[in-house]
Amino acid sequence: MDYALERGVNFWDTAEMYSVPSAPETQGSTERIIGSWFKQSGRREDVILATKITGLSRMTYVRDADVSWTRHTKDQVDEAVHKSLQRLQTDYIDLYQLHWPDRAAPTFGSKMRAKDYTYAYEPFEEILAHLQSHIEAGRIRHIGVSNETAFGVMRFLAESNARGLPRMASIQNAYNLVNRTFEDGGLEEVCVHEKVSLLAYSPLGQGYLTGKYRNGALPDGSRKKLFERLG
């Protein structure tokens, strides 16, 4: 982290579920590492800090409360914000993001049928209101989405405009030479016109674009060798 700052890398992004692959025994570890560095270095003000709340999932180990699903309800947003602040050893987060939607949506390459969209749906205006309370309290400064669709971005923006609620400033989605869904799925048009900034992740396609897996190679220490399901 010292090395990164010395070379001008001052935007740091994490999430409550990290490290990856996520597991109960390692959940929150990335935030704790960053928090320890903040405490030791005293350089919190030098960093633009981003983190994320888990979307709709069965990873209920991220919550102290007894829940069946992780959702973006008021209670879960409150708990997630406070626990991230504790692990990060800071009193504010510069950019707080919804890691993926709190609804049935075609995320992470999933294929959806019409009936699949009906089993879970998120109240966009309520989620924005939950986040607004933390902005007003000074705990978070800006909000964004991640792994979101053009529909989701526009629904959040529509509620912001209609109700005077906080506006999504950014979207963090995959984007690289072989994954162009940001361009092809309508998101690029939405974000250009609505001034929602793209934070592109996976620029090297999980390492495939480096060429290290060419011809079936599997180098020691590579992501695919260590975690086959992430390759």
Describe each PLM feature range.
Residues P101-G231:
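Beta/alpha (TIM)-barrel catalytic core signal, keyed to glycine-rich beta->alpha loops juxtaposed to Asp/Glu
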Residues A4, W12, I34, L49, ...:
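Conserved, mostly hydrophobic/aromatic
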Residues E25-S29, I33, S68-Q76, M112-E126, ...:
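Alpha-helix N-cap and loop-to-helix initiation/capping positions
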Residues L85-K111:
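Active-site groove signature of glycoside hydrolases
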Residues M1-L5, T70-R87, F124-A129, V153-A158:
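Short, acidic/polar
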Residues P21-E25, S57-R71, A104-R113:
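Surface-exposed, active-site-proximal loop segments in enzymatic domains
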Residues R44-V47, D91-L95, R141-H142, P166-A169:
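Short acidic capping loops at alpha-helix termini that bridge into adjacent secondary structure
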Residues M1-I53, D78, D91, H130, ...:
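N-terminal binding-site loop/beta-alpha segment at the start of enzyme catalytic domains
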